[in-house]
């Protein structure tokens, strides 16, 4: 049996869940989220916990078991706590600011880059060099954060650009002659 699939999912207070006709719905203080799932699997609620069970050990059921449990757990956590991904800007003059709901990045191009958030995602800029991407859908928050990072990926030689907080960038050495020593004459 799937190690992930057999783990129960705790349902926090204030979150209501419903699973029928192949759609799992979770409602909580942060909003409402629906996740489609394969109807061959069963999602049951017992003692404030959700259990995802599969009808057999067939390959397709085993493949869907852990996936479905994780998607359901992400939906429950999203509507109760939400998800946040933090990005940081490194580079001289690199900064971000909010213009209404949109994120405006000044990151070394001849023009500012404006990113409009999709429905369900919000931006926050606590510092000019830090961006928080927030929402209830884990997949959507991660995709938007990756799109923001893609605007100016970290440079391989200096590390300048947009990166996730805590991300380690493997820097290249650069030219061998740029060590500052005396060159040939």
Swiss-Prot record:
SUPFAM superfamilies linked: Ribosomal protein L6
Lineage, opening ranks = Bacteria, Thermotogati, Deinococcota, Deinococci, Deinococcales
Q: Has keyword Nucleotide-binding? A: no
Q: Write out the GO MF terms.
A: rRNA binding; structural constituent of ribosome
- Which function does this protein serve? This protein binds to the 23S rRNA, and is important in its secondary structure. It is located near the subunit interface in the base of the L7/L12 stalk, and near the tRNA binding site of the peptidyltransferase center.
Q: Which GO terms describe its biological process?
A: cytoplasmic translation
Q: Which GO terms describe its cellular component?
A: cytosolic large ribosomal subunit
Protein family membership: Belongs to the universal ribosomal protein uL6 family.
Organism whose genome encodes this protein: Deinococcus geothermalis (strain DSM 11300 / CIP 105573 / AG-3a)
Gene3D superfamilies reported in the protein's UniProt record: Ribosomal protein L6, alpha-beta domain
Q: Which UniProt keywords apply?
A: Ribonucleoprotein, Ribosomal protein, RNA-binding, rRNA-binding
Q: How does it assemble?
A: Part of the 50S ribosomal subunit.
* Protein's UniProt name: Large ribosomal subunit protein uL6
């Amino acid at each position: 049996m799937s190690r992930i699939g057999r783990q129960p999912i705790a349902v926090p207070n204030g979150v209501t869940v419903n699973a029928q006709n192949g759609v799992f719905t979770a409602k909580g203080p942060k909003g409402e989220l629906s996740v489609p799932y394969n109807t061959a699997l069963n999602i049951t609620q017992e003692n404030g916990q959700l259990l995802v069970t599969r009808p057999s050990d067939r390959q397709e059921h085993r493949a869907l078991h852990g996936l479905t449990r994780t998607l359901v757990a992400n939906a429950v956590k999203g509507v109760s706590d939400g998800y946040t991904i933090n990005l940081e800007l490194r580079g001289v003059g690199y900064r971000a600011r909010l213009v209404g709901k949109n994120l405006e990045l000044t990151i070394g191009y001849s023009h500012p880059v404006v990113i409009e958030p999709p429905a369900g995602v919000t931006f926050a800029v606590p510092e000019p060099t830090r961006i928080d991407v927030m929402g209830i859908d884990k997949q959507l928050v991660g995709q938007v954060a990756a799109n923001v990072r893609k605007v100016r990926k970290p440079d391989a030689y200096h590390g300048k650009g947009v990166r996730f907080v805590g991300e380690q960038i493997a820097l290249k050495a650069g030219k061998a002659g740029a060590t500052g020593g005396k060159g040939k004459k």
